[in-house]
């Protein structure tokens, strides 16, 4: 949690010719964004976790957030065992994490399986962080085009009888589904972490910025496109692109 700053509002009244002073103590959270290294953001490692591990040793963050595309040949917790006791590890998934059953299992069945930020808001080091895993697929939904399927239930209903979500092809599991995306607009967060980019990038999607605005998000961090940059989109939302195997702080400063 952020540190607490205390200050007082003083009201003075007169009672029986005497001054009566009321002090009301007010607390507010210290601005977590003023401590940029409290959370680090790791761009697509593609099997190379050395820069992230080095950054944790150097900057001692409270938490790290990984932005997808791990290309895991062993469980994620094994790859990061050197920093397991040094910081919190959180993550979203990228398209590469659904390429094979092994890559998928090494992420979703790892000891960090409960640190998946997808489709929920989690308080991390005093900030509300919401995650959006996966990518837009033409066979599911590719904005600004209309979605091919309203949601997973719609897709599954079109398949053979008794086909369950667990049987969905990995390619479809990697997709951003329209109904899940829209449901996020009911949540509130400070930071959005996504694999896909918003409209700040030439290969980004305007709808991600619209989603961020609906949630009250002030900063977006994304991976996928292997570029470090800082930009501003509509509604004064800051966007920080984090390159492959790069690490950035809360201000978007490249640390590795």
Predicted regions and their residues:
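N-terminal active-site segment of His-dependent metallophosphoesterases
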Residues: 7, 14-85, 99, 186-188
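Active-site-proximal loop/helix segment associated with metal-binding centers of metalloenzymes
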Residues: 127-195
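Active-site environment of divalent metal-dependent phosphoester hydrolases
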Residues: 46-52, 71-75, 95-103, 121, ...
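Active-site neighborhood of phospho(di)ester-bond hydrolases with catalytic His/Asp-centered motifs
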Residues: 41-43, 64-69, 89-96, 117, ...
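Glycine/small-residue-rich loop that forms an oxyanion/phosphate-binding "nest" at active or ligand-binding sites
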Residues: 101-118
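Binuclear metal-dependent phosphoesterase catalytic core
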Residues: 35-36, 51-54, 122-125, 210-215, ...
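Short amphipathic alpha-helical segments and helix-helix/interface helices
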Residues: 52-56, 76-84, 105, 181-182, ...
């Amino acid at each position: 949690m952020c540190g607490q700053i205390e200050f007082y509002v003083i009201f003075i009244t007169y009672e029986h010719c005497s001054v009566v002073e009321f002090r009301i103590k007010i607390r507010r959270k210290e601005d977590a964004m003023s401590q940029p290294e409290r959370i680090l953001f790791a761009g697509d490692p593609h099997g190379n976790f050395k820069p992230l591990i080095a950054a944790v040793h150097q900057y001692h963050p409270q938490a790290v957030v990984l932005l997808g595309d791990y290309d895991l040949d062993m469980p994620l917790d094994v790859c990061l065992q050197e920093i397991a006791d040094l910081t919190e590890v959180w993550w979203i998934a990228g398209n590469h994490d659904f390429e094979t059953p092994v890559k998928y299992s090494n992420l979703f069945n790892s000891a960090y399986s409960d640190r998946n930020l997808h489709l929920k808001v989690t308080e991390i080091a005093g900030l509300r962080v919401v995650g959006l895993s996966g990518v837009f697929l033409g066979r599911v939904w590719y904005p600004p085009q209309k979605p091919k399927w309203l949601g997973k239930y719609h897709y599954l209903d079109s398949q053979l009888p008794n086909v369950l979500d667990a049987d969905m092809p990995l390619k479809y599991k990697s997709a951003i589904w329209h109904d899940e995306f829209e449901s996020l607009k009911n949540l509130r967060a400070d930071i959005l972490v996504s694999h896909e980019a918003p409209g700040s990038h030439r290969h980004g999607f305007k709808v991600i910025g619209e989603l961020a605005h609906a949630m009250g998000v002030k900063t977006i961090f994304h991976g996928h496109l292997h570029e470090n940059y800082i930009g501003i989109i509509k509604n004064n939302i800051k966007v920080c692109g984090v390159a492959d195997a790069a690490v950035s702080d809360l201000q978007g400063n490249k640390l590795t």
